[in-house]
């Protein structure tokens, strides 16, 4: 009989613009929640700069201190050198797993042999792509929101055929 693993609950990153104080309050509440894994970071727009990289890292440390697994979410589209600099700080944080929402982040993690979560913004629609990401260090995949249940079932069958599930 196969051993079943306990299901883990994840809380995704806040996708709306909230003030730094509101985010801090939210994540303090999340620390006391039943969520096992908490994703945090600016994943939508770098122009929303009320919360800086250092602030996100401080919140991540606080959450980790309360027993949560923390994943730092990254931008879905890197457009400026300032955004690249911030991404480097995330990649080089030394403590937390990253959610790669851009292939540039995948590359940065792979170059450093760092594990990463493939975020829903990556265009990953088949098992061959998942196998490539696995070889680059992916430890978890978040399915793109536009995919259906039937697509997922088919993809899981492809993964079984490739021996990567």
Indicate residue ranges for each PLM-predicted region.
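Catalytic alpha/beta core domains of metabolic enzymes, predominantly
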Residues: 104-106, 115-165
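Active-site mouth loops of central-metabolism enzymes
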Residues: 5-25, 49-50, 75-78, 115-124
């Amino acid at each position: 009989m196969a051993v079943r693993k306990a299901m883990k609950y994840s809380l995704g990153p806040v996708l709306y613009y909230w003030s730094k104080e509101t985010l801090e309050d939210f994540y303090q509440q999340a620390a006391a929640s039943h969520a096992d894994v908490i994703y945090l970071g600016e994943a939508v727009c770098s122009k929303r700069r009320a919360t800086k990289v250092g602030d996100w890292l401080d919140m991540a440390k606080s959450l980790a201190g309360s027993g949560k697994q923390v994943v730092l979410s990254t931008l879905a589209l890197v457009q400026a050198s300032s955004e690249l600099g911030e991404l480097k700080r995330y990649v080089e944080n030394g403590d937390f797993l990253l959610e790669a929402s851009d292939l540039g982040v995948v590359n940065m993690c792979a170059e450093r042999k760092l594990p990463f979560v493939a975020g829903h913004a990556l265009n990953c629609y088949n098992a061959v792509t998942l196998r490539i990401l696995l070889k680059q260090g992916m430890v978890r995949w978040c399915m793109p929101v536009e995919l259906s249940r039937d697509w997922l079932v088919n993809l899981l069958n492809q993964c079984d055929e490739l021996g990567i599930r």
